């Protein structure tokens, strides 16, 4: 197969220009100008961007246990439509992904039903109860790419310290959901003007920041890397920026909703904008964008969190936290980061391909010859209107319905197989 005449961008190989890509037996074998083939599929990519397949370091596939929200088949269909070729799924399933049986189940089901590469993340604590460490070696050898109790914080500092020590033995990333539950205290949105106007219990930004500070200190103390999930506040960004300057091995991610939306999106009790950590203020949004620009924030993840309509169609206090993200993440990043000049395409590829692969220790996120052909082809300028009813995800809980965005995904190739062709899932 030949991908012809597209604008290829891959910071890992310092590629940024009009090139052809030759794919043979699912492997990238040549990148250069004017490559010819006598027979085989030719994809004409003139006027489009050709990027390494996107890698999502943080999503929820809800399988096993919550298949009424999403399963591995529908989740990976949605990922493919959004240009993602590799995704890492969080362990808050039922049963929790805290042992090799669940890891193997996810890997095998993804091989059977999956449209993209799926990598399980194991739980830090058994049952995500925060009491006893999972068998981290067992998780790693079964195929887990990281450990996290995402959805819940690790409340005990000594348990988190031990998790870091074990993670360094087994060379596996630790991803921390930073939330002080005592401070969050049952809040349902960001504490501020809008929570006051709506009469809802607020979550102070300090609930995130205190745990970010703790985890930075534990990482510094143990000399083991830590990765902070879904950073949403100005002070969190500042704490991580300062820690990096001191040489602490801390990395972090944010999600599109934290650089696009503020807590005003919750007005009129819009449960589609209810998420954890909550949407913050304009000042926080600007700080997150600044953190992306200066490299403090390494990764853009989706935190794709599908919920059944019935779980959102209730009073704000009772609604589930989270939003689907696969099919809007790249267009939101293009529209709100690349178009205004905050990031170049090359920097965006670092945050959505190169750095997530590095965190998870997987051989993805680049178009190097010899690598499997995971490739995403995007029209940077094409404008479209988000329609949640067209999402391939089982769940449609997105606050972005009706948004005008740039950046349509035209093709997604996974291991050399075309799974999305001309914006249609095959």
From Swiss-Prot:
Annotated SUPFAM superfamilies: Composite domain of metallo-dependent hydrolases, Metallo-dependent hydrolases
Class in the EC hierarchy, top level: hydrolase
Keywords, ordered alphabetically: Hydrolase, Metal-binding, Pyrimidine biosynthesis, Zinc
EC number: 3.5.2.3
Cofactor: Zn(2+)
Note on cofactor: Binds 2 Zn(2+) ions per subunit.
Annotated binding of Zn(2+) 1, by residue: 58, 60, 150, 303
Keyword Ribosomal protein in record: no
GO BP annotation list: 'de novo' UMP biosynthetic process; purine nucleobase catabolic process
Catalyzed reactions per annotation: (S)-dihydroorotate + H2O = N-carbamoyl-L-aspartate + H(+)
Keyword Zinc: yes
A GO cellular component entry from the record: cytoplasm
Binding site for substrate: 60-62, 92, 276, 307
GO molecular function: allantoinase activity; dihydroorotase activity; zinc ion binding
Active-site residues (renumbered): 303
Pathway recorded for this protein: Pyrimidine metabolism; UMP biosynthesis via de novo pathway; (S)-dihydroorotate from bicarbonate: step 3/3
Residues reported in the UniProt entry to bind Zn(2+) 2: 150, 177, 230
Pfam families: Amidohydro_1
CDD domains: DHOase_IIa
Leader sequence segment: none
Alphabetical list of HAMAP family matching this protein: PyrC_classI_B (MF_00220_B)
Stated role: Catalyzes the reversible cyclization of carbamoyl aspartate to dihydroorotate.
PANTHER family reported in the protein's UniProt record: ALLANTOINASE (PTHR43668:SF2)
Similarity comment text for this entry: Belongs to the metallo-dependent hydrolases superfamily. DHOase family. Class I DHOase subfamily.
NCBIfam families xref list: pyrC_multi (TIGR00857)
Name of the protein: Dihydroorotase
Species name: Acetivibrio thermocellus (strain ATCC 27405 / DSM 1237 / JCM 9322 / NBRC 103400 / NCIMB 10682 / NRRL B-4536 / VPI 7372) (Clostridium thermocellum)
């Amino acid at each position: 197969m030949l991908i012809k005449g597209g604008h290829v961008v891959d910071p890992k190989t310092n590629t940024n220009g009009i090139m052809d890509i030759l794919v043979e037996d699912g492997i990238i074998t040549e990148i250069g100008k004017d490559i010819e083939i006598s027979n085989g599929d030719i994809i004409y990519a003139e006027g489009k961007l050709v990027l390494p397949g996107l890698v999502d370091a943080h999503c929820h596939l809800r399988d096993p246990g919550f298949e009424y929200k999403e399963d591995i088949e529908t989740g990976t269909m949605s990922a493919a439509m959004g240009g993602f070729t590799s995704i890492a799924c969080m362990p808050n399933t039922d049963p929790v992904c805290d042992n090799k049986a669940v890891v193997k189940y996810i890997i095998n089901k993804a091989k059977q039903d999956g449209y993209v590469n799926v990598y399980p993340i194991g739980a830090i604590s058994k049952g995500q109860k925060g009491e006893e460490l999972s068998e981290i070696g067992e998780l790693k050898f079964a195929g887990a790419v990281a450990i996290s109790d995402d959805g819940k914080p690790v409340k005990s500092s000594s348990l988190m310290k031990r998790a870091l020590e074990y993670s360094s033995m087994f060379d596996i990333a630790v991803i921390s959901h930073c939330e002080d539950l005592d401070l969050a205290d049952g809040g349902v949105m960001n504490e501020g003007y809008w929570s006051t106007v709506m009469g809802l219990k607020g979550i102070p930004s300090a609930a995130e920041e205190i745990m970010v500070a703790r985890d930075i200190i534990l990482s510094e103390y143990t000399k083991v890397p830590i990765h902070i999930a879904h950073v949403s506040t100005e002070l969190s960004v500042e704490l991580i920026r300062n820690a990096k300057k001191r040489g602490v091995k801390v990395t972090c991610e944010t999600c599109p909703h934290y650089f696009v939306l503020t807590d005003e999106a919750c007005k009129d009790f819009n449960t589609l904008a209810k998420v954890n950590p909550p949407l913050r203020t304009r000042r926080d949004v600007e700080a997150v964008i600044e953190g992306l620009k200066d490299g403090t924030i390494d990764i853009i993840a989706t935190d794709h969190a599908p919920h059944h309509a019935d779980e959102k169609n209730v009073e704000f206090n009772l609604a589930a936290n989270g939003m689907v993200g696969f099919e809007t993440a790249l267009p939101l990043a293009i529209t709100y980061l690349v178009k205004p000049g905050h990031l170049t395409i090359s920097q965006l590829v670092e945050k959505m391909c190169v750095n997530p692969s590095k965190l998870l220790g997987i051989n993805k996120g680049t178009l190097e010859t010899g690598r499997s052909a995971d490739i995403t082809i995007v029209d940077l300028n094409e404008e479209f209107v988000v329609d949640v009813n067209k999402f391939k995800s089982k769940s449609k809980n997105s606050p972005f319905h009706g948004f005008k965005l740039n950046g349509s995904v035209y093709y997604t190739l996974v291991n050399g197989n075309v799974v999305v062709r001309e914006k249609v899932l095959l």
